[in-house]
Amino acid sequence: MKFMSQIEFYHNLYVSECWQKKKGKIVKRLKKKKLQPQVYVITLSQGEQNQLEFFSSVLLKQSIFEHSKLFVIGIADGYDEALFLVEEIVQDVYQETKSANARQFLLTDQAEYEKKGR
């Protein structure tokens, strides 16, 4: 029996501007691990010592992700757009907290959102 990775999405998901109208469809396809070569996912880093990482959604097909729990912060239209969104995320975090600790801010923000009942 194959286990699917557990993918959770940030309530205020960062999305490339060109994909705003397709966001729901892209998220649904990511949950089903459908191939979307142009989609890059921005996640909290698997190692807690790091903040964010991004990679092509095609990598979600690899067995290393079968038992992984991923918290997706953003979806981007390719590598360059992923770089841009990571910069935007860090700037937003710094503006809110005067710190670059994106991991802590995003997890706390998500927990508060879930506490309010979505």
Question: Where in the sequence are the language-model features?
Answer:
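Generic secondary-structure transition motif, activating predominantly at the C-termini of alpha-helices
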Residues: 31-34, 90-97
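Structural boundary micro-motifs
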Residues: 5-7, 67, 109-111
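Short, solvent-exposed secondary-structure capping/transition elements
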Residues: 51-53, 81-85, 95-102
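Charge-dense polyanion-binding interfaces
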Residues: 93-118
